[in-house]
């Protein structure tokens, strides 16, 4: 779970403008490695059905997918922005349920096991904030 953070640290070693250095330092300070679990481990059956039949997650729409899930269940699901390695780091959105993290884009839209990838969150937001 360190390659995304190492990438940020390597960027800070480059000859950057002060604003760029400040950006990467803020990113590094906010970075929190997380582990993704299967949605079925933390969601109820009706929530899983809602994802499949109402949200209908789509590939390349992680921000939309995660946002809609947070809005559907605002009392228990947070929206997260960060990065994942697949195998290169990409900006990505996923969700937090209690103390667990899920990725409905990888799991439902791409039919992949997201737990095999490295994830880092830079921010976790409730429905009112996003």
PLM features per residue range, with description:
Residues 1-130:
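A structural boundary/capping signal
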């Amino acid at each position: 779970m360190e390659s995304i953070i190492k990438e940020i640290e390597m960027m800070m070693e480059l000859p950057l403008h002060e604003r760029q250095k400040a950006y990467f330092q803020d990113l590094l300070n906010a970075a929190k490695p997380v582990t993704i679990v299967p949605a079925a481990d933390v969601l109820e059956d009706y929530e899983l059905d809602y994802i499949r039949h109402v949200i209908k997650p789509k590939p390349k729409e992680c921000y939309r997918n995660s946002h809609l899930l947070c809005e559907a269940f605002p009392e228990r699901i947070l929206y997260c922005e960060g990065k994942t390695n697949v195998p290169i780091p990409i900006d990505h959105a996923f969700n937090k349920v209690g103390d667990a993290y899920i990725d409905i884009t990888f799991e439902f839209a791409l039919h992949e096991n997201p737990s095999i990838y490295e994830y880092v969150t830079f921010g976790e937001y409730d429905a009112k904030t996003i």
